[in-house]
Amino acid sequence: MSLSVCRVLRQEALYCRAKAHLKEKQYGLAVVDLTPLSKEVRTAMGAEAKYQLAHAYFQLGSIELAEQEVMSFTQMQTSQQYWLAKSLILLADINIQRNDIFQAKQYLLALQTNYRQEDDIQSIIVEKLVALEEMNINEEVNEIEEDTL
Protein backbone atom coordinates (compact mmCIF):
# COMPACT_ATOMS: atom_id res chain seq x y z
CA MET A 1 0.00 0.00 0.00
CA SER A 2 1.31 3.42 -0.87
CA LEU A 3 2.01 6.05 1.74
CA SER A 4 -0.78 8.33 0.48
CA VAL A 5 -3.35 5.50 0.64
CA CYS A 6 -2.30 4.75 4.23
CA ARG A 7 -2.62 8.44 5.09
CA VAL A 8 -6.14 8.63 3.61
CA LEU A 9 -7.23 5.47 5.44
CA ARG A 10 -5.86 6.84 8.71
CA GLN A 11 -7.73 10.11 8.20
CA GLU A 12 -10.96 8.27 7.45
CA ALA A 13 -10.52 6.12 10.56
CA LEU A 14 -9.90 9.21 12.73
CA TYR A 15 -12.91 10.91 11.17
CA CYS A 16 -15.21 7.94 11.87
CA ARG A 17 -13.95 7.63 15.43
CA ALA A 18 -14.34 11.38 16.01
CA LYS A 19 -17.93 11.27 14.71
CA ALA A 20 -18.66 8.38 17.09
CA HIS A 21 -17.20 10.34 20.02
CA LEU A 22 -19.31 13.37 19.08
CA LYS A 23 -22.45 11.25 18.88
CA GLU A 24 -21.73 9.94 22.39
CA LYS A 25 -20.95 13.49 23.61
CA GLN A 26 -17.37 12.45 24.40
CA TYR A 27 -16.03 15.83 23.35
CA GLY A 28 -12.60 15.48 24.93
CA LEU A 29 -11.92 12.28 22.97
CA ALA A 30 -13.32 13.87 19.82
CA VAL A 31 -10.88 16.78 20.17
CA VAL A 32 -7.94 14.35 20.03
CA ASP A 33 -9.11 12.89 16.71
CA LEU A 34 -10.36 16.14 15.19
CA THR A 35 -7.20 18.14 15.82
CA PRO A 36 -5.02 16.53 13.12
CA LEU A 37 -7.95 16.35 10.69
CA SER A 38 -8.71 20.05 11.09
CA LYS A 39 -5.38 21.15 9.64
CA GLU A 40 -6.53 20.65 6.03
CA VAL A 41 -9.74 22.64 5.46
CA ARG A 42 -9.71 22.46 1.66
CA THR A 43 -11.46 19.09 1.84
CA ALA A 44 -15.00 18.58 3.12
CA MET A 45 -13.70 16.23 5.82
CA GLY A 46 -11.08 18.69 7.00
CA ALA A 47 -13.47 21.65 6.99
CA GLU A 48 -16.08 19.69 8.92
CA ALA A 49 -13.37 18.59 11.37
CA LYS A 50 -12.38 22.24 11.92
CA TYR A 51 -16.00 23.17 12.69
CA GLN A 52 -16.55 20.10 14.86
CA LEU A 53 -13.33 20.84 16.77
CA ALA A 54 -14.53 24.37 17.56
CA HIS A 55 -17.96 23.00 18.49
CA ALA A 56 -16.41 20.35 20.76
CA TYR A 57 -14.41 23.03 22.58
CA PHE A 58 -17.63 25.04 22.94
CA GLN A 59 -19.42 22.02 24.41
CA LEU A 60 -16.54 21.51 26.84
CA GLY A 61 -16.89 25.12 28.00
CA SER A 62 -13.58 26.16 26.45
CA ILE A 63 -15.06 29.26 24.85
CA GLU A 64 -11.71 30.89 24.09
CA LEU A 65 -10.41 27.78 22.32
CA ALA A 66 -13.64 27.49 20.36
CA GLU A 67 -13.32 31.11 19.27
CA GLN A 68 -9.66 30.62 18.32
CA GLU A 69 -10.58 27.67 16.10
CA VAL A 70 -13.34 29.63 14.35
CA MET A 71 -11.11 32.66 13.85
CA SER A 72 -8.29 30.53 12.45
CA PHE A 73 -10.80 28.84 10.12
CA THR A 74 -11.85 32.23 8.74
CA GLN A 75 -8.19 32.94 7.89
CA MET A 76 -7.65 29.64 6.07
CA GLN A 77 -8.42 29.26 2.40
CA THR A 78 -11.34 26.91 1.94
CA SER A 79 -14.01 26.38 -0.66
CA GLN A 80 -16.10 24.58 1.96
CA GLN A 81 -18.54 27.42 2.54
CA TYR A 82 -21.08 25.31 4.45
CA TRP A 83 -18.65 24.46 7.26
CA LEU A 84 -17.32 28.00 7.35
CA ALA A 85 -20.89 29.29 7.71
CA LYS A 86 -21.58 26.77 10.49
CA SER A 87 -18.45 28.06 12.23
CA LEU A 88 -19.67 31.65 11.99
CA ILE A 89 -23.00 30.59 13.50
CA LEU A 90 -20.99 29.00 16.30
CA LEU A 91 -19.16 32.32 16.70
CA ALA A 92 -22.56 33.95 17.21
CA ASP A 93 -23.31 31.32 19.89
CA ILE A 94 -19.99 32.12 21.54
CA ASN A 95 -20.95 35.78 21.67
CA ILE A 96 -24.36 34.89 23.10
CA GLN A 97 -22.59 32.86 25.79
CA ARG A 98 -20.55 35.98 26.57
CA ASN A 99 -23.77 38.01 26.67
CA ASP A 100 -22.66 40.08 23.66
CA ILE A 101 -26.00 39.88 21.90
CA PHE A 102 -25.26 42.81 19.61
CA GLN A 103 -22.14 41.15 18.16
CA ALA A 104 -23.90 37.80 17.83
CA LYS A 105 -26.70 39.44 15.88
CA GLN A 106 -24.21 41.24 13.62
CA TYR A 107 -22.48 37.96 12.70
CA LEU A 108 -25.83 36.36 11.89
CA LEU A 109 -27.08 39.31 9.84
CA ALA A 110 -23.84 39.47 7.84
CA LEU A 111 -24.02 35.75 7.17
CA GLN A 112 -27.69 36.02 6.21
CA THR A 113 -26.82 38.71 3.66
CA ASN A 114 -23.74 37.05 2.18
CA TYR A 115 -24.40 33.30 2.26
CA ARG A 116 -26.02 32.14 -0.98
CA GLN A 117 -25.96 28.33 -0.89
CA GLU A 118 -29.22 26.33 -0.97
CA ASP A 119 -29.04 24.37 2.29
CA ASP A 120 -30.10 24.66 5.94
CA ILE A 121 -27.86 27.61 6.86
CA GLN A 122 -30.46 30.31 6.17
CA SER A 123 -33.09 28.54 8.30
CA ILE A 124 -30.58 28.15 11.15
CA ILE A 125 -29.81 31.87 10.93
CA VAL A 126 -33.51 32.77 11.07
CA GLU A 127 -34.04 30.49 14.10
CA LYS A 128 -31.11 32.12 15.90
CA LEU A 129 -32.27 35.65 15.07
CA VAL A 130 -35.79 34.86 16.32
CA ALA A 131 -34.33 33.41 19.53
CA LEU A 132 -32.19 36.54 20.00
CA GLU A 133 -35.23 38.75 19.52
CA GLU A 134 -37.16 36.70 22.10
CA MET A 135 -34.22 37.03 24.52
CA ASN A 136 -34.25 40.78 23.96
CA ILE A 137 -38.01 41.01 24.60
CA ASN A 138 -37.71 38.91 27.77
CA GLU A 139 -34.90 41.15 29.05
CA GLU A 140 -37.01 44.24 28.42
CA VAL A 141 -39.98 42.70 30.26
CA ASN A 142 -37.74 41.78 33.20
CA GLU A 143 -36.35 45.32 33.34
CA ILE A 144 -39.87 46.77 33.33
CA GLU A 145 -40.95 44.38 36.10
CA GLU A 146 -37.90 45.30 38.18
CA ASP A 147 -38.59 49.01 37.70
CA THR A 148 -42.18 48.64 38.91
CA LEU A 149 -41.23 46.78 42.09
Predicted features and spans:
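Acidic, polar-rich low-complexity tracts and alpha-helical solenoid repeat scaffolds
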Residues: M1-L149
